[in-house]
UniProtKB/Swiss-Prot annotation:
Catalytic activity field: N(tele)-phospho-L-histidyl/L-threonyl-[pyruvate, phosphate dikinase] + ADP = N(tele)-phospho-L-histidyl/O-phospho-L-threonyl-[pyruvate, phosphate dikinase] + AMP + H(+); N(tele)-phospho-L-histidyl/O-phospho-L-threonyl-[pyruvate, phosphate dikinase] + phosphate + H(+) = N(tele)-phospho-L-histidyl/L-threonyl-[pyruvate, phosphate dikinase] + diphosphate
Keywords for this protein: Kinase, Nucleotide-binding, Serine/threonine-protein kinase, Transferase
Natural source organism: Pediococcus pentosaceus (strain ATCC 25745 / CCUG 21536 / LMG 10740 / 183-1w)
Function: Bifunctional serine/threonine kinase and phosphorylase involved in the regulation of the pyruvate, phosphate dikinase (PPDK) by catalyzing its phosphorylation/dephosphorylation.
Residues annotated to bind ADP: G153, V154, S155, R156, T157, S158, K159, T160
Presence of the UniProt keyword Kinase in the record: yes
GO MF annotation list: ADP binding; ATP binding; phosphotransferase activity, phosphate group as acceptor; protein serine/threonine kinase activity
Enzyme Commission number(s): 2.7.11.32, 2.7.4.27
Protein name: Putative pyruvate, phosphate dikinase regulatory protein
Family: Belongs to the pyruvate, phosphate/water dikinase regulatory protein family. PDRP subfamily.
Amino acid sequence: MEKQKKSINIYILSDSVGDTGDQVAHAAAAQFLDVEFNFARHPFIHTISLLDSILNKAVREDAMVFSTFVNPELNQYAADFCNQNTLKYLDVLTPAVNLFAEKTNLAPENKPGRTHSLNAKYFDKISAMEFAVTYDDGKDPAGFLKADIVLLGVSRTSKTPLSLYLANKGYKVANLPLVPQTQIPDEIWQVDSNKIFGLTTTKEVLNNIRRQRMIAYGLNPESSYSNMDSINKELQSADELFKKIGCLVINTANKSIEETATIIMESLV
């Protein structure tokens, strides 16, 4: 009989969106696989009365509390309340803000949502997301000439999710699936090879992914799509293309999207 996981509630409080606290809480919780965490984000808290109501609910649920208040009054109230009611509490933002204040000898703005200001970077990110969708899967070869990054790879090497992740970082990304016996668009040969990244994997990983995909669609997993010999030829053909282009090749087997994206971004510097 499977052992039931311990369940813990986590409240994320903010006078802005609460993304920062949410990311920190999830990152820390990921280190405890045997515990079931229930996350409840409470953004845009601007009054003591609303904060008090939420904190009292946290007491009833014996929740852990993460906060990213920039309003000193709200921040102090949350800290005092949690201390008095023995709630586990983490003020995520204040230590970092204080560190910057000490180093710069300047007072913080104490204005919530500064990281979400509608500035040029924000609009660049939106534009990059639209670009990634428009030029996904080699839909329009013209996109390769406009892109900051071009991803090439056989199917199931995470080209689309990687494109969207990089777009969220502000990069315009176009990707092309490498299909056997299909001609490579002329535009690829006109792109600076430093902007092109070849995505590969192991034949075992690709075989497993493709078999599971066929099963999910109710199809026979024993097909040319998932055949080991066919996969081996696909990967060899892709490797030969990468060598001709002279691009960086990344093996995505056992790598997260974030890890692959980091390698790409660092290579562009």
